[in-house]
């Protein structure tokens, strides 16, 4: 039995400062039938804390956030998960005195005016690969001394930005 040697593959992990876009290599189809975007490229072109969708499955989205400085406070309508992809991010959590600030039926999270009333739950200092639960009934705030990138798993909300035509590959990748 003959053993085939695998192709040499190199895994490269990008960052906000250094990434290779990559792309879908279409054999016999149309690139528009596939979704491909680069989270670091999307974050590099976004304003701090814009919630840009980079993945979607029915009402669920993966949003890319450019972390830079201090965000406003937000309250999720359902549990959300923040995965740090680049940089160091401080996530401040507090248990809301009034969880009713998020109306029933809301999807995603809501921006809150100022610092909401509540009990401090703690602070998470997360780096690349760390995931943090952002629980319903709490409020959260991000802080990054240096620019970073967070992927946020949530439901598409009123401030989810969908830029599919801008961020997705729409033509075959050029061959070398």
Model segments located where?
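Short acidic-glycine-tyrosine-enriched beta hairpin
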Residues: 96-136
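Conserved short histidine dyad/triad with adjacent acidic residue
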Residues: 61-78, 95-99
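Short hydrophobic/aromatic patches on the structural cores and recognition surfaces of FHA
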Residues: 65, 87, 129
